[in-house]
Structure formats: structure tokens, C-alpha cells
Amino acid sequence: MGRSLKKGPFCDEHLMKKIEKLNETGQKQVIKTWSRRSTIFPQFVGHTIAVYDGRRHVPVYITEDMVGHKLGEFAPTATFRGHAGDDKKTKR
């Protein structure tokens, strides 16, 4: 279920300030953040944001296609190792 349209998109204030500061100076550097819940805005395009996945910061390069999505969508938290079970090939 999505967010109400009357509320608008959400982005943490500290992250938005960092992006605006980099846009003013024209610098490109990696921004570390724990804010997986923040929506990607058009101002973010071209920046690399290191999103925390619970273990480490995953670098995510922001493109135009990502606008409107959440940062957490691009940094998976769990790695699927496969289902546990009998390995029938090794028993033969």
C-alpha cells in the first residue's frame, strides 16, 4: 500500500541537506546513509549514495529511472543461500 498523495513523498531532512550542499558546490562524493526509507528525488540523480543494508553500506548510483523509489529497494538486506534439504546427487 502506497503513501497518501496528500502527504507527498518523504525524504529525511539530513539527507536532503547533504544532497543540496553537494549540488551547490558541484562536488560528487559518496554519501553514507542509514535512511532506507527516503524517497529518491530528481536532485539525487548523478550522485552515489551508500545505503546501509544491516551489515555494510552498499553504494547505489542514482539514475533517472530510480526517481520515486525508496533507497532501500536498491540495497537488499538478506542474501538467499538456497533451500536446505537433502542433496540427492551426493548420496549416490
From Swiss-Prot:
Task: Sum up the protein's function in the record's words.
Answer: Protein S19 forms a complex with S13 that binds strongly to the 16S ribosomal RNA.
Signal peptide residues are: none
Q: Identify the keywords attached in UniProt to this record, alphabetized.
A: Ribonucleoprotein, Ribosomal protein, RNA-binding, rRNA-binding
Report the transmembrane regions from the record.
none
What family classification does the UniProt entry report for this protein?
Belongs to the universal ribosomal protein uS19 family.
The impact of changing residue 13 to G is:
In strain: 10
Cellular component terms, GO, for this chain's entry?
Answer: cytoplasm; small ribosomal subunit
Picking any one GO molecular function of the record gives: rRNA binding
Q: Which cysteines are joined by disulfide bonds?
A: none
User: Known Pfam families for this protein?
Assistant: Ribosomal_S19
Biological source species: Geobacillus stearothermophilus
Q: Which InterPro entries match?
A: Ribosomal_uS19 (IPR002222), Ribosomal_uS19_bac-type (IPR005732), Ribosomal_uS19_CS (IPR020934), Ribosomal_uS19_SF (IPR023575)
Lineage of the species this protein comes from:
Bacteria, Bacillati, Bacillota, Bacilli, Bacillales
Q: Which GO terms describe its biological process?
A: ribosomal small subunit assembly; translation
The name this protein carries in UniProt is: Small ribosomal subunit protein uS19
